[in-house]
Amino acid sequence: MSDRISVVLAEDSLLVRDSVVRALSTDPDVTVVGVAEDYDAAVALVAERSPTIVVTDIRMPPTSTDEGIRLARWMRTAHPHIGVIVLSNYADPGYAAGLLERGTAGRGYLLKERVARFEELHDAVHQVADGGT
């Protein structure tokens, strides 16, 4: 891949945040260009940095409910060219249903337990960067 994939990470858990950044740093095609701990900071970073992809927790402040899905929906309207990967502890496909609708560049849903498998995270990032799901 000739173009680097730029990533904004939105995750409130320090442990998960560090794990994702560490995993992504092992991929020579990927650069993490910003890290946010909540929805508002993520919106500001996306607007400022215009990354290739946003990797976001499904639940984060300020409400700790579905801020990641809210972020993905906002991006679908405001920045439809930016891909989204939502991270979750929940295997329930209902959490991903709204995300996987048409309208965003690439999109994905990845269980947090898979982040430890660097290759799976790398594959997801590359697939979403290429417009896939």
Describe each model-derived feature in a short phrase.
Residues 57, 88:
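Active-site residues of response regulator receiver
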Residues 14-34:
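Two-component/phosphorelay signaling modules centered on CheY-like receiver
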Residues 35-53:
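Acidic, metal-coordinating helix/loop segments flanking the phosphotransfer/catalytic sites
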Residues 11:
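Conserved acidic carboxylate
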Residues 1-6:
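Non-catalytic signal-transmission and effector/linker regions of two-component phosphorelay proteins
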Residues 94-95, 113-129, 133:
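C-terminal output helix
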Residues 58-62:
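The short loop immediately C-terminal to the conserved phospho-acceptor aspartate in CheY-like receiver
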Residues 44, 65-81, 97-102:
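Short amphipathic alpha-helix used as the core "switch/output" element in two-component signaling
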